[in-house]
Amino acid sequence: MRCRAGVSAALGAALTLLLLLLRCDPVAAAALRGSPKGGNERPIIGILSQECHFKKFHQFGSSYIAASYVKFLESAGARVVPIRLNLADEEYDKLFHSINGVLFPGGGVDLRTSKYAKVAKIFYQKALEANDKGDYFPVWGTCLGHEELTYLTSGEILLVNTNTDGFSFPLNFTSAAKNSRLFKNFPDDILHAFATEPLTSNFHMWSISMQNFTKNEKLRNFYKVLTTNTADKLEFISTMEVCLLQHTNTPFMVSSGIQRKMPMSGRTHQAFHIPHWL
């Protein structure tokens, strides 16, 4: 069983990620989103819902948001609103201008034809436009959200099968990580724990390989890779963020690992000997 310090490091690192996602530029927020000039201490984050394909749950509704994502954001001080799948365009526009950021969660729907994909594209485009105008609107994609954002940027399905459902890995940091928006303020002990202990949970069958990333000019010019992992000798991307040189005010970050899974979910797996007493 992993030591208490290691698990505490994992939770602390996960919450540090959230602090970055939730940080709102006070000037931009006040100017464009009606926040007080002192900034927004309780930012509102939208979580994209997705279609429910489990028939036994259809009695409760046709779409869902995993509760662990809500708990994860609320644990960092955010308020959460659902982004539903069947709203009119004007309703999405109103919702976009009423929130401070968006999270595209993990799941299992089609990256091109699902309602999840359709609504993700709407908020992706609106976020790009807002950030280009000087607003600060962060977008975080986890697992399926990571895959969706790479598709929206590249226009191609570039996934490869890595069979990484139910594994935990340490992170292999790239040279870009040290000065990245995401990791530059991490304490050294947290970075060391991430690099040496298997603290990132993975529940995905598909990944973006470094080879496919490097070959795609749109991805290469938009994102920089911060961490990778290797499965069966295939190197795949586990964390990346927007290139600041090209898109200075665009806080888009993506992760294939699921940071909220261990502290917020009761699911267990033989590959994870992580206690849930935190």
Q: Would you name each region that the model predicts?
A:
Residues 2-241, 246-250, 256-278:
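N-terminal beta1-alpha1 cap of cysteine-dependent amidohydrolase-like domains
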